[in-house]
């Protein structure tokens, strides 16, 4: 990058693979600081880790501190130099559950700053294609969970548990806040230990230090669940049962969090 500001594409062309691991805090701003370091050193790190993914390695580990001002300048350079489409794609793909997402994004950004805004359109390029694969996975999960989230009543609040591969709570937020504008509810992502909480019409995304255990559903809720399961089983015409079709529309990994499927999980 040039000074503390933007990325210089001429310097990006002198890129080399480095036997070093970046370690950052897992936040988007922290990732942007990894991007800055990569450009400043003209290097592609061997790996980029968060504390949760840290493991034994023979390579030196470089701690990348999160600097808010630096991260803001890096992010501003995306829109200014690469365009809104690239800014959107990088921001969205950071929510991917792929363990190598940071490395894929850094490789793409080096290419994009070298070639310009049109890089994002080169979907067949080996450093561009993975970004669309991550986006496809995110879009697919968001679409599925908009229909498959099952709420239970817990002490006057609606609660649901999900196990997504990607961190999709920020992407689910507009849908469920629009669907339940007057309700108090929470959606707990048990994989990423995060909660989407709406209370008194205020919505927050919270990262938890420990797993969350929801209280048992109320007796009234259990009665409704029993009725729903009975309705679900009665609705099906057994002679037309299509297990392949059912698995296609509702993959088995969703079943554990769906009331009507728990008996079959």
What is the role of each PLM region?
Residues 2-67:
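N-terminal ordered "arm"
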Residues 65-74, 202-214:
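Acidic, Ser/Thr-rich peripheral helices and adjacent loops at domain boundaries
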Residues 20-27, 62, 126, 157-168, ...:
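Conserved aromatic-histidine-acidic binding/catalytic patches
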Residues 89-93, 190-191, 240-247:
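Short coil/turn segments at secondary-structure boundaries
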Residues 30-41, 107-114, 174-178, 226-233:
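Short, hydrophobic/amphipathic alpha-helical patches that form generic packing surfaces
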Residues 49-144:
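Charged, alpha-helical interface segments at or near domain boundaries
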Residues 117-208:
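Internal, well-folded beta-alpha domain core
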Residues 182-184, 195-202, 212-265:
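Long, compositionally biased intrinsically disordered terminal regions
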């Amino acid at each position: 990058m040039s000074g503390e500001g933007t990325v210089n594409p001429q310097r990006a062309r002198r890129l080399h693979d480095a036997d070093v691991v970046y370690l950052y805090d897992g936040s988007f701003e922290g990732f942007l600081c990894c991007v800055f370091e990569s450009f400043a050193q003209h290097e592609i790190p061997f790996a980029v880790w968060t504390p949760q993914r840290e493991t034994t390695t023979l390579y030196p580990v470089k701690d990348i501190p999160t600097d808010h001002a630096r991260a803001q300048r890096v992010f501003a350079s995306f829109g200014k130099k690469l365009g809104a489409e690239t800014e959107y794609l990088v921001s969205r793909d950071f929510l991917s559950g792929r363990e190598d997402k940071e490395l894929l994004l850094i490789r793409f950004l080096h290419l994009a700053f070298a070639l310009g805004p049109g890089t994002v359109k080169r979907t067949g390029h080996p450093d561009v294609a993975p970004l669309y694969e991550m986006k496809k996975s995110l879009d697919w999960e968001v679409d599925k969970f908009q229909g498959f989230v099952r709420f239970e009543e817990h002490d006057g609040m609606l609660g649901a548990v999900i196990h997504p591969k990607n961190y999709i709570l920020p992407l689910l937020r507009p849908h469920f806040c629009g669907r339940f504008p007057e309700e108090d509810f929470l959606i707990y992502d048990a994989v990423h230990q995060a909660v989407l909480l709406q209370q008194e019409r205020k919505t927050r995304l919270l990262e938890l230090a420990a797993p969350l255990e929801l209280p048992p559903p109320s007796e009234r809720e259990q009665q409704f669940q029993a009725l729903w399961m009975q309705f679900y089983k009665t609705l099906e015409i057994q002679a037309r049962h299509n297990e392949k079709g059912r698995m296609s529309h509702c993959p088995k990994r969703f079943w554990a969090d769906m009331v009507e499927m728990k008996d079959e999980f």
